[in-house]
Amino acid sequence: MEELQRHFEIDGSRQQRFIYPFLFQEYIYALAHYYALNGSIFYETVENLGYDKKSSSLIVKRLITRMHRQNRLIISINDSNQNRFIGHNKNLYTQTVSEGFAVIMEIPFSLRLVFSLEEKEISKSHNLRSIHSLFPFFEDKLSHLNHVSHILIPHPAHLEILVQILHCWIQDAPSLHLLRFFLHDYHNSKSINAQKKSIFVCSKENRRFFSFIYNFHVYESELMFVFLRKQSSHLRSTSFGTVLERTHFYGKIEHLVVVLRNDFQKTLWLFKDPFMHYVRYQGKSILASKGTHLRMKKWKSYLVLFWQSHFYLWSQPERIRINQLYNHSFYFLGYLSGVRRNPSVVRSQMLENSFLIETSIKKFETLVPITPLIGSLAKAKFCNVSGHPISKPSWADLSDSDIINRFGRIYRNFSHYHSGSSKKQTLYQIKYILRLSCARTLARKHKSTVRAFLKRLGSKFLEEFLTEEEQVLSLIFPRTPSPSYRSHRERIWYLDIIYINILTNHV
């Protein structure tokens, strides 16, 4: 790992960085296997893995030879059982090399992340990966803005565009040819059965490789936007960084910025907006501004033209929707978010004259929609489509404690993820559904009625189903007579949540 770090060390020079020699390092494939199991990026050292750093060109030579050999056999053998078996092995070899290629490409961007965090003196950078870290940003910014746009990030229509994008970073021809081989090989294998599917629909076999390709595509699409945003603002941007799903990208392409500065200097006045904010999530993005509706339409036109000119991709205008914040709510990561106005009247008296002053305070609200959650619970067989709790027959063979723990853990996950809701009535309804579904499952197991079963267990069943949030709040606010009342009002954001709730994600 130290050898790789020295090779990709960030300095001011424009040295040539050759990728392909590392494909002949045996520990690269050990790293790919290790990080595929752990789903992390490269902060650890290779010594922790217990692998040696010995070179083995024989491994890669065998893989390449077998791939070419299988290609010839597939051409000569048509529609036979052996052909299907050979195709499976070919995919396995391609997967091995592509995962190693992705490992090598992720390292320089991981180093850029570490360098940027150290330069900005950001401590506890792992908190930036939390999904909940976006909501405090919304609370602080959106209440002062007027318009919001929802953008569906498009995908490039041609694979060569992806190769040209990565050409700015990969400067050796063999690696570019290898990248082109991976993309076209995957595209050809999938085009027969799924011609309409995007190349970015990551398969389980090549998840890391295509996650890296997708992240780099998004990084490139945001690069010009960030440049224009910085140029159009009179105030210096205090912080900027893109935190992606799998790999963290920081930095700019210097020569590309020079070209853009020459091309767009005359049109920058169209985009002068010091109150523009941008958030990306799950292949979508949100653009919020304090400007007028006309200014948002200019940003919309710019994005459409940018996708067409830079990626040669025709994007439908309906991909970008513009709405006013104070009368529009948007679904965001399991929450129904929006800005609500609280009108108030203040009476002011000066000598013998009195005045009535009408004011309104904007407040960012995060609500949990009940209908989608009931739909996801119905899919998981905890209730019917109308929200009536039903038993879980597949869990009836478990012990009583395991059944109670499973239902309790599901609700605690719900409560933990949706702890930032402005109103908790939805969570109380979810608690009722899961608690009664648990009771029905236990009653079904013991061939009893729900009423008789609850009467036999008493309050012990309810105590084991109590949420941890109410217990913690009762310790933090001991003087509050009712912890549930306090939990009904408080919004809590946890910085340890890096995955969306699985049932919420079904919506």
From Swiss-Prot:
InterPro entries: Domain_X, Maturase_MatK, Maturase_MatK_N. GO terms for cellular component: chloroplast. It is found in: Plastid, Chloroplast. One of its GO terms (biological process) is tRNA processing. GO terms for molecular function: RNA binding. Pfam families: Intron_maturas2, MatK_N. Its main location: plastid. Keywords: Chloroplast, mRNA processing, Plastid, RNA-binding, tRNA processing. Belongs to the intron maturase 2 family. MatK subfamily. Usually encoded in the trnK tRNA gene intron. Probably assists in splicing its own and other chloroplast group II introns. This is Maturase K. It comes from Cananga odorata (Ylang-ylang tree). The gene is matK.
